């Protein structure tokens, strides 16, 4: 479960978040929309502990964001421009991610994860030659590899073709059925959601 209360963030004189309150319950998919520049990505970065808020608080499974190790073990984040080590293969990138999260080998089935996102036949190719859509699929695999309880997806459909979009909708439905909390920033995705929130003027409604 993800909760945020009164989150604030400014960049210089511009206040992007003025007091954001939101809750995403376990087993719930929430769509977050808003104009470009409204602060959606900033909000997700704060919730993923990639940026610090200027004020307010947020918790993941009752752990405050300041408890970075616990929170990061529970969060899966996919940005709209996922980064990988281009000189490493898809499999090697996931193996590195598993090591960073100290995942036991018996809990990490990387081949099955790559197959699930349609990349098994490309798993030994360097990610530097992957298309944007393939990188997005690999990002989804990485996001789910450590079995997070909360998933934060920032424009995950943007680089995907029709098959990829269908796959992502299926994955999100599976995460929901697995009682995970899912917060998605997207436009016109056709995704089935439980609630839609709008970020405007620095607050969520």
Where are these regions (language model features)?
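Catalytic Walker B motif of ABC-type/P-loop ATPase nucleotide-binding domains
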Residues: 151-155
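Conserved ABC ATPase "signature" region
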Residues: 95, 99, 105-122
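Helix-to-loop junction immediately C-terminal to a conserved catalytic motif
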Residues: 48
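Conserved structural motif at the start of ABC-family nucleotide-binding domains
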Residues: 2, 17-19
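Conserved ABC transporter NBD signature motif
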Residues: 56-71, 199
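Hydrophobic anchor residue at the start of the ABC signature
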Residues: 140
């Amino acid at each position: 479960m993800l909760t945020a209360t009164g989150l604030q963030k400014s960049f210089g004189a511009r206040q992007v978040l003025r007091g954001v309150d939101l809750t995403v319950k376990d087993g719930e998919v929430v769509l977050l929309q808003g104009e470009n520049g409204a602060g959606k990505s900033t909000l997700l970065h704060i919730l993923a502990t990639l940026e610090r808020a200027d004020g307010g608080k947020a918790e993941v499974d009752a752990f405050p964001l300041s408890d970075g190790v616990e929170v990061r073990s529970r969060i899966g984040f996919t940005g709209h421009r996922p980064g990988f080590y281009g000189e490493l293969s898809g499999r090697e990138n996931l193996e590195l991610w598993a090591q960073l999260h100290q995942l036991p080998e018996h809990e990490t089935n990387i081949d099955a994860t790559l197959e699930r996102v349609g990349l098994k036949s490309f798993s030994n190719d360097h990610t530097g030659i992957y298309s944007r859509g393939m990188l997005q699929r690999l990002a989804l695999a990485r996001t789910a590899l450590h079995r997070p309880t909360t998933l934060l997806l920032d424009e995950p459909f943007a680089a995907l073709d029709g098959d990829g979009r269908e796959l992502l909708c299926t994955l999100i439905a599976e995460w929901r059925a697995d009682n995970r909390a899912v917060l998605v920033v997207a436009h016109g995705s056709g995704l089935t959601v439980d609630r839609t929130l709008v970020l405007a003027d620095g607050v969520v409604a």
